[in-house]
Amino acid sequence: MPIFNLHQLRNFLFIIATTLFLSACQIESKPTSELDQIKQRGVLRVGTLNNQLSYYIGPDGQTGLDYELARQFADELGVKLEVKVAFRQAELFPMLKRGDIDLIATGLNQTPRAIKQFRPGPSYYYVSQVVVYKNGALRPRNLKQLVEYQNAKTASEDEAEASNNAAANTLQVVKQSQNVTLLKSLQSDYPELQFTTVSDADNYDLLRRVSTGELRFAISDSIELSLAQRLYPDLATAFEVTEDQPVSWFVRRSPDESLYALMIEFFGNISQSGELARLEEKYIGHIGSFDYVDTRAFIRALDNKLPKWAPLFEQYSAEFDWRLIAALAYQESHWNPLAKSPTGVRGMMMLTLPTAQSVGVKNRLDPEQSIRGGVEYLRRIVARVPESIPQHEKIWFALASYNVGFGHMMDARRLTKRQGGDPDSWGDVKERLPLLRQKKYFSQTRYGYARGDEAKNYVENIRRYYQSIIGHVGQNSLIASDQEGEIQVIPPLENSELVAASDIDAAENEALSPDVGVSQATLTTEVQP
């Protein structure tokens, strides 16, 4: 029987240990795909911007079009979502280049320079870039006129006045933003076009400055302008600088296409399922029309009337956001507690007598009773909305019912289904509501004729008022609570500098250079899958 001596045993164990170690090294050195790394990490790291569309803190916590898309994408991967919120576009591309984030999820244009260094995902909506001015002020109709206005000087101007006018006429854009690249391309044809870059503001701030008269012109994308007009109705489009451009997410350019391929599949799936259309309807479906006179009156009411009634809206809003109830009340009565209609509805929430009696309101002209009763009536309608409708869209169906009646709303859903639409999508159903006026259609419904077009406009108006109130009271901020994450304050950067055609390359290079030392002013927050 063979016997191992101690020396042989040690050699044997050494050989086995060495073999196992080398095998482990080979396993560890084996490259894994980017997608596998994300799954092993258990976290998808997404960079986005803090604005009204991509990401903000709403009454129910984190929200935004890109936030919801990113959360669904993380769910599909089966990992947590880690959101890194930047305040400037210039921070996002370097973060992606360094590997601090896995993708950029915010509405960025597919500029040639960005596409050269990074890989865009599928386009999920389109925007045009426009020159913005204040309604009633001097309006340039094209770039040639804009340059003429910038360089004009009247005979009566002294040097100080001329300097002030030149500053006001100069376009301002956010430093290291994609608009820097756009204006460089425009300067090739209009070398006298002047613009200033600023470090202490975002695009929304610049639009506000145009509204207040501090600036005469700014550049904005069409959707951003539409959102800003709800608070600054004086803003208007002078002319379009570009045609509609695609916006998309971005990932790193790499031979490894695992993450990119799954992103393509993800957008294809949500496009086919209708989920993408539902989310776009939720966030931008209400911004198509703009009534200057109505918006001006509403902005005045925000300052003069809302402070008086806000406590009651907050007290009786129940499970609803009080700002939504305030928007509903403005649509009904313009916050007039004594409002009356020839049709018999009365009060702040314009209740009919039978409705008031059903919710325990004895005096419809008492604002407290009216608000309490209106909220209770809305709550009952929401409870009747079919469960098949997505939670975030139930309120729009309920508001349509508040206006036109529950039966007519259900008629519109059935009509939508007959026409091949989705009866659970507000975006589809709202387009069928106006058909309830036409005999060709209402003769085939259970409840007959209805002013469905008014119900559609009613809901869209409330949505616009709601977004304006959110912006006005300043509660769409980045920080919701200590649990949401920790924010780092952006240190002030250098003052505005005039960018001429000769030095614009430096600014553009900074925006996309992987080595630029940007301040990491980000909020990092984790979301469970």
UniProtKB/Swiss-Prot annotation:
The reply to whether Disulfide bond figures as a keyword in the UniProt entry is no
- Gene Ontology terms, cellular component aspect? cell outer membrane
What InterPro entries does this protein's entry cite?
A: Lysozyme-like_dom_sf, MltF, Solute-binding_3/MltF_N, Transglyc_AS, Transglycosylase_SLT_dom_1
> What Pfam families does this protein map onto?
SBP_bac_3, SLT
Q: Where is this region: LT domain?
A: 288-529
Q: Where is this region: Non-LT domain?
A: 28-287
- Alphabetical list of SUPFAM superfamilies matching this protein: Lysozyme-like, Periplasmic binding protein-like II
- Which reaction equation describes what this protein catalyses? Exolytic cleavage of the (1->4)-beta-glycosidic linkage between N-acetylmuramic acid (MurNAc) and N-acetylglucosamine (GlcNAc) residues in peptidoglycan, from either the reducing or the non-reducing ends of the peptidoglycan chains, with concomitant formation of a 1,6-anhydrobond in the MurNAc residue
Compartmental location: Cell outer membrane
- The ranges of region (Disordered) come to 510-529
- GO function terms (MF aspect): peptidoglycan lytic transglycosylase activity
Q: Which residues are catalytic?
A: 332
Function comment = Murein-degrading enzyme that degrades murein glycan strands and insoluble, high-molecular weight murein sacculi, with the concomitant formation of a 1,6-anhydromuramoyl product. Lytic transglycosylases (LTs) play an integral role in the metabolism of the peptidoglycan (PG) sacculus. Their lytic action creates space within the PG sacculus to allow for its expansion as well as for the insertion of various structures such as secretion systems and flagella.
Recorded domain comment: The N-terminal domain does not have lytic activity and probably modulates enzymatic activity. The C-terminal domain is the catalytic active domain.
| Name of the protein | Membrane-bound lytic murein transglycosylase F
